[in-house]
Amino acid sequence: TEIQVRVYPKSATFKRAIGYRMTPDAPLQMTKETGFHPRTSELTRSFGEYRGYWVPHRFTAAGPVEEYWACREKVVVMDLSPLRKLEIMGPDAESFLQSVFPRDIRKLAAGQIFYTALCYEHGGMIDDGTLFRLCQNNFRWIGGDDASLLWLREQAAKSGAQVLLKSATNDIHNVAVQGPKSR
């Protein structure tokens, strides 16, 4: 067989990548950097793959013990961009969500957010996360697992509700600011 040789200039950079699939039959996606990577890469070279994204494992200036105590006693910033985000829109959005979440969605006013579980009909938990009501017929679910997005899409198709479910994970990158001094 022929051997193909490519020559690259010294200035060429090559990014690490791992293939990720939402489901076994889903198209392969390569790991991505979050929107915060340019800044976090100045603070560490220790990144790990999490749900298709490279996120910091630890920062060079502090060790894991110091980071733990900062979270318990001070403040930390965590890149949570890999959390799964799903926009749920349409005239039946509220009634659809009312049928799939165990909380009373009708009590959630525009601009409010609450923590909830997402459960199967028999009560088994699929995922937990937050549901944000952006306006009357527009919501955003933020959960940790691809299974919740897939299950919500299945339920929307079964229900016949007039809702549009749009993945926003790649469009919205977020950090969590946590700890007792986070306010």
What are the language-model segments listed below?
Residues 2-183:
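Basic, glycine/lysine-rich polyanion-binding surfaces/domains
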